[in-house]
C-alpha cells in the first residue's frame, strides 16, 4: 500500500489541466435554473441534454443525495474614521465551535476569519451600523489572536439579535473570485440551492443550483429516493493547487452532519446512489471510511485525514461500514453524527458509496478535477473537450454533467 500511496501522492497537477478561455466562464446564471445544458457520461459514451430532462433520466429506486447547506452572508465591511474599509470574511465558527450554537448566539461569538486591508487595522475594535427589520443595530469586531494564518475575531452586537440575523442584516453573500465581479441582489437567490436550510457555507454546492422544486417533486413522485446531508463548504474550495505534486497540497477541513436515518438507508442500499455535487461525494465517501475506522477499533472516527482512506483496511462492504456507524448511534443515543473530513479523492481512488454524480465543470489543476478523474479515469479529457467544443458554460454558474462512475 505504501508504494501505491506514493504513486498517488506523486500525481502531477499539471497533468490535470486544460485551456479554459475566460469567455467560457459563466459570470451569471441563466434566467431559469433548469435551462442549463447537461452532459451525460455513461458506459464510456457522452450524450447531451437539458437539465430539465433530469426527471426522465433518473430511475425509481435510485437514491439522490443533496447537500442542504446554506450560504451565509460571510463578508462584513467596516469603515474606520480615517475612511479605510476593512473587510472581514467569516470562515468558520470558533466559539461556540458548533455552527447552530454560534448562529444562535445573542450578544457575542468568535469566528476564524480572513481580513482584507489588515494593515489599516492596527489596534482597537472596529464597528459598523446596520438595519434589520425597522431598527438599527451596531456590530463590533475585535482581534483576539492569529492562528494558522487566520485571525480569530470576536463579534459583539446590540439589540438581542441572533448572529444569524446579524449576518443577514450586515453581511454580503460571497461570490467566487474567478467571477471577477461583486455579488449582486440576484445572487441572494441564485447562489443558493432551492433546498438549502443549514447555515454555514461560504460557497454554494453549485451542482445543486440547477434543481427546481418542480424537478424535485417529479423525481419523488417517480420513486427516486431524495435524501439530504450537510457539509459546510469553506473558502478552501477555491484554493488553487500550487504544489507540483498533489502529495504536497494540504486539503482544507470540512464540517459535516449526517443523520441516523441516512446511515440506515445507506446500509440497506437497494439502488444506485447518485450524489449531487462534489461536496456530497466527499461526505458520502468520508462516511464509509469513518465506519471502517470504527470497525478497526479507532475511537477518533469522527475525523478523517487527507490520505487515511488509502491506508485503512480496504475490504469492508458498505453495509458493514454503515452497521458500525449505526452501532455508534445506538450506543451514543444520538440522531446526528457531527464530524470533520479532509479527504482527498484522486485518480486511483476506488469509490465505495456513490455510483454516479451530478457536477459542474471545474477549474484546471483543481482537486475537484482530480475527483472527477477518479470517477471517469482518463475519459475526463474526452468529457472536458466535448464541453469546450459544444458551447458548455463552466464553473459555479455554468452547465452541469451527470457522470457515471467507472467500476474497475
Place the predicted regions along the sequence by residue.
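Surface-exposed, charge/polar-rich loops and edge strands
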Residues: 1-408
Amino acid at each position: 500500500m505504501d508504494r501505491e500511496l506514493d504513486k498517488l501522492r506523486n500525481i502531477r497537477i499539471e497533468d490535470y489541466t486544460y485551456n479554459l478561455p475566460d469567455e467560457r466562464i459563466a459570470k451569471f446564471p441563466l434566467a431559469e435554473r433548469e435551462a442549463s445544458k447537461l452532459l451525460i457520461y455513461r458506459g464510456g459514451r457522452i450524450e447531451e441534454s437539458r437539465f430539465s430532462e433530469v426527471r426522465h433520466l433518473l430511475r425509481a429506486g435510485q437514491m439522490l443525495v443533496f447537500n442542504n447547506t446554506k450560504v451565509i452572508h460571510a463578508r462584513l465591511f467596516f469603515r474606520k474614521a480615517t475612511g479605510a474599509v476593512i473587510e472581514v470574511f467569516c470562515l468558520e465558527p470558533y466559539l461556540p465551535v458548533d455552527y447552530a450554537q454560534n448562529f444562535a448566539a445573542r450578544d457575542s461569538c468568535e469566528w476564524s476569519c480572513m481580513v482584507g486591508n489588515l494593515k489599516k487595522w492596527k489596534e482597537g475594535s472596529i464597528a459598523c451600523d446596520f438595519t434589520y427589520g425597522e431598527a438599527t443595530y451596531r456590530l463590533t469586531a475585535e482581534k483576539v489572536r492569529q492562528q494558522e494564518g487566520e485571525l480569530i475575531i470576536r463579534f459583539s452586537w446590540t439589540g438581542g439579535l441572533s448572529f444569524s440575523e446579524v449576518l443577514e442584516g450586515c453581511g454580503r453573500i460571497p461570490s467566487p473570485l474567478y467571477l471577477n465581479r461583486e455579488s449582486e441582489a440576484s445572487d441572494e437567490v441564485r447562489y443558493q440551492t432551492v433546498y438549502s436550510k443549514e447555515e454555514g457555507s461560504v460557497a454554494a454546492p453549485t451542482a445543486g443550483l440547477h434543481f427546481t422544486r418542480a424537478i424535485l417533486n417529479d423525481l419523488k413522485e417517480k420513486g427516486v429516493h431524495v435524501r439530504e446531508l450537510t457539509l459546510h463548504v469553506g473558502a478552501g474550495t477555491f484554493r488553487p493547487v500550487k504544489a507540483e505534486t498533489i502529495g504536497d497540497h494540504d486539503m482544507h477541513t470540512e464540517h459535516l452532519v449526517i443523520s441516523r436515518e441516512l446511515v440506515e438507508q445507506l446500509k440497506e442500499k437497494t439502488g444506485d446512489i447518485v450524489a449531487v455535487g462534489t461536496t456530497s461525494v466527499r461526505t458520502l465517501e468520508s462516511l464509509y471510511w469513518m465506519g471502517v475506522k470504527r470497525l478497526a477499533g479507532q475511537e477518533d472516527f469522527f475525523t478523517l485525514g487527507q490520505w487515511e482512506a488509502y491506508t485503512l483496511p480496504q475490504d469492508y462492504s458498505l453495509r458493514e461500514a454503515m452497521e458500525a456507524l449505526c452501532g455508534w448511534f445506538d450506543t451514543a443515543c444520538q440522531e446526528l453524527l457531527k464530524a470533520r473530513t479532509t479527504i482527498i479523492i484522486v485518480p486511483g481512488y476506488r469509490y465505495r458509496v456513490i455510483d454516479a454524480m451530478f457536477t459542474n465543470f471545474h477549474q484546471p489543476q483543481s482537486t475537484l478535477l482530480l475527483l472527477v478523474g477518479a470517477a471517469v479515469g482518463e475519459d475526463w479529457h474526452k468529457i472536458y473537450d466535448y464541453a469546450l467544443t459544444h458551447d458548455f458554460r463552466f464553473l459555479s454558474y455554468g452547465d452541469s454533467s451527470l457522470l457515471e462512475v467507472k467500476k474497475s
